[in-house]
Amino acid sequence: MTTGGLVDENDGAAMRPLRHTLSQLRLHELLVEVQDRVEQIVEGRDRLDGLVEAMLVVTAGLDLEATLRAIVHSATSLVDARYGAMEVHDRQHRVLHFVYEGIDEETVRRIGHLPKGLGVIGLLIEDPKPLRLDDVSAHPASIGFPPYHPPMRTFLGVPVRVRDESFGTLYLTDKTNGQPFSDDDEVLVQALAAAAGIAVANARLYQQAKARQSWIEATRDIATELLSGTEPATVFRLVAAEALKLTAADAALVAVPVDEDMPAADVGELLVIETVGSAVASIVGRTIPVAGAVLREVFVNGIPRRVDRVDLEGLDELADAGPALLLPLRARGTVAGVVVVLSQGGPGAFTDEQLEMMAAFADQAALAWQLATSQRRMRELDVLTDRDRIARDLHDHVIQRLFAIGLALQGAVPHERNPEVQQRLSDVVDDLQDVIQEIRTTIYDLHGASQGITRLRQRIDAAVAQFADSGLRTSVQFVGPLSVVDSALADQAEAVVREAVSNAVRHAKASTLTVRVKVDDDLCIEVTDNGRGLPDEFTGSGLTNLRQRAEQAGGEFTLASVPGASGTVLRWSAPLSQ
C-alpha cells in the first residue's frame, strides 16, 4: 500500500518471501530440466553404446543362420521390442530364410507355417522402405494373423541392404513399455540394419566359398573314381550322392538313355539307373518319357532348370514333388543324361547360386564320365588289337614252325629201324598235331572275342524280349567285360535271366523289371521287379533250379524284397574261373 508515492514498509516486507519462493520454484524447474537433459544424454549414450555392441555382435560370425539370429536378438534388445524377425529373399522375392524371436516353439508348431511374404511383410519386400506403425492391423496391406499367432500392435520394419540391393527385412513389434516405436528407434534400427547387411553379405560369401570348395572336392572324387578304372555306369550313384550332399536336398536320381550312343533328339525315354533317398528308392529301373516340356528342355537342349514343382511323367511316386533342380549331364556337344535333385522344402529351397554351381558340377561329372568311357573303349580296342596280332603271329609263325617240325619228324620215322623209337616219333607227331589244333582253336576264340560280347548281349536281350507280349516294361544293363564269360557260363546266364523274368511275369505280377548283368571277378545277375514282393512262403521248381545252378557253378543265389518298396530283388552270381 502506498502513501504519497511512498511504499509502505510493511508491504515491502511481505513481498520478499514471495519473491524468494518464486525463485526457488524456478530453480527447481531448471534443475529438473537439467536432470532430464542429463538422463536423455545418458540414455542416448547408452543406446549408442548398445548400437555399437549390437554391430560388433552381428558382424562377428560367418555362419548365415547364426548371423541372422544374432541380428534379430540384437535389434529386439536395442529398442526393447517383445517380438522380432528377419526374412531373407531372392531376386524373385521368394522368402529363403526366416528367423524369429519372442515366439516359443509350441506356438510356432500350432501356427503351422512361417510367413510367406504376404501382407505388410510382402509390402516391405516389394517396396523396401522403413515403415513405422502404431497399429499394424489398421494398415491397408494388413491381412491379419493366422490362428494361434500372438496379437501384435506397434510395428517397425526396416530393409536390409547390400550395395543398394535389398535382400531382407528386419521386423520388430510391441515395445515392452506399450509405447509406439519412436524416431530414435527407427534411426537406431536403420543403423543396425546397415551393419546387418554387411554381416549377411559376408556370411553368404563364406557360405558360397564353402559350397564351391565342396563342389571342387566332389568333382575331384568323381573324376578320380572314373579315371582310376571304375566302370563308368557304377559312378552315377556317386554323382547322385554328391548332388544330394552339395544341395542339402532330400532325394536325387540319375536317368540316362538306354542306348548311350543314340542322339539326344532321338531319345524317347530315359532310364532311372541310380537313386539316393527313400522317396525315390522304388523307381530304379523305371523309365521317364522325354515328352515333358521341362525334361525335354533339359535333356535335348541341355538347359539346367530350377522348378518349384516337378512332374515326371510315369513316376506317380513323384507326382507334384516339391522344388527340384534338373541338371543335364553335358559333355562335348552331347547330353549323357539328367540329374534330378528334389527337396521337401517350400518354394525357394534352391537358389540361383545353387543352380549355377550344380550345373557346373554336372558338366564336370559328365566330362569325366565321357573321358572314362573313351578310355574304356580304347582299352577294349587295344585288347582286341592285341588278340588279332597274337592270332596272326600264332598262325603265320608258330603253327608253320610246328608243322615243319612235325613233317621232319614224320619223315624220319621210316629211316629208323628201332620199332620203339619209331613209335615214340609217331606219338610226338600226333602230339604236335593236337597242339596245332589247340592253337587253331585259340586263334578262332581270339578272333571271335569281340563277337562274343555281342552274342552274350543278344542272348540276354532275347531272353528278356521273349516276354515282350506280357506288357512288362523291361530294361537291361551290362557292366564289365562280357568277352571273358565262357560259353558254359553264358549258357547259365541266359537260363537264369529267362527263369527270373518268367517268375516276375507269372508269379510277381510285376509291371516293370530291370536286369543288370555285371562282370567283375564274378558274373553277377540282378533282376529287380516292382511286383507283389515275397510271399510268406515261396517254393517252386524255377527257384530251385536257380539255386542249384548257382551251387553247381560255385556261386550264390538270394531272393529278397526291395527295401522300402514293393517288389523283389533276385541276385545270382558265379565265379568266372571254374
Swiss-Prot record:
Q: Where does heme bind?
A: 149
Q: What is the effect of changing residue 87 to D?
A: No change in autophosphorylation when NO-bound, loss of autophosphorylation in deoxy or CO-bound state
Residues of the GAF domain: 63-200, 231-369
Effect seen on changing residue 149 to A: Weaker than wild-type heme binding
Q: Which residues carry this modification: Phosphohistidine?
A: 395
Which superkingdom, per the lineage? Bacteria
Record-listed N-acetylthreonine modification sites: 2
Give the location in the cell. Cytoplasm
**PROSITE patterns per UniProt:** HIS_KIN
A GO BP entry: response to redox state
Q: What is the effect of changing residue 204 to A?
A: No autophosphorylation activity no matter the bound gaseous ligand
What is the reaction catalyzed? ATP + protein L-histidine = ADP + protein N-phospho-L-histidine
Q: What happens when the gene is disrupted?
A: Cells lacking this gene show no changes in gene induction following hypoxia, or exposure to NO or CO. Another publication shows a severely attenuated response to CO. Cells lacking both this gene and DosT have no response to hypoxia, or exposure to NO or CO showing both proteins are required for the hypoxic, NO and CO responses. 95% decreased induction of the DevR (DosR) regulon during anaerobic growth, 50% decreased induction of the DevR regulon upon exposure to NO during aerobic growth.
Give the top-level enzyme category. transferase
Enumerate the residue ranges of region (ATP-binding domain).
454-578
Record PANTHER family:
NITRATE/NITRITE SENSOR PROTEIN NARX-RELATED (PTHR24421), OXYGEN SENSOR HISTIDINE KINASE RESPONSE REGULATOR DOST (PTHR24421:SF56)
Supply the name of the protein. Oxygen sensor histidine kinase response regulator DevS/DosS
